[in-house]
Amino acid sequence: MRLLVAIALGSLLISSMNGADIERAQALARARDSERQQFHARYVINLSDPVVTQIEVITEFRRLVIIAEEHVRRGDWMFTRSTRAAEEALATTRGVITIKAYVRFSPLNTFNEPPAYALAIGAPAKNSPLQGVSTQLTPQHSVPFRTPDRKTLSSLIGVSLDTNVGADRIGQATRAIGVTLDGKEVARTTVDFARLD
């Protein structure tokens, strides 16, 4: 509980992590499941939209927590005690925020390839325009199944969208994060980056 209070008191988008921030992230990775789940919940926004189901934010601080948690799962507890190892793990993603969105398709869809969904960022005002950002699409397929003529197929059931944005572009402000299809807004939510580590 004290760890969560310390995180809440120091919570703001950290543009450049120092040794104390790294140690705090590593301590969180060693914390109880309930504390880690509570931490991660701030970064995952579940939407009521039937198509765009979730938007997730991964800051540099959270990325280190995720990396350290993976090391702990593999039994490598020493990673969570080494500032140097953490700095090396973050070297290629310094100052980068990853934004993800998950799009679910109707089970009756006939897509051979995923439609051109994209992530977009804008001002928090409801009617403010969103600016598209370079987005990587990763198709999600169903479990393979056999057809009556003995072919093995799988259907396209969704897509995950990913983008990397410089923390300096986002800043410590509230931003609208949206998903567009052919330039038209499909879903939108706001994220207060000043409240994230």
Q: Can you annotate each of these PLM segments?
A:
Residues 1-4:
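Positively charged n-region of N-terminal signal peptides that target proteins for export
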Residues 6-14:
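Bacterial N-terminal signal peptides
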Residues 17-197:
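Conserved functional micro-motifs across diverse proteins
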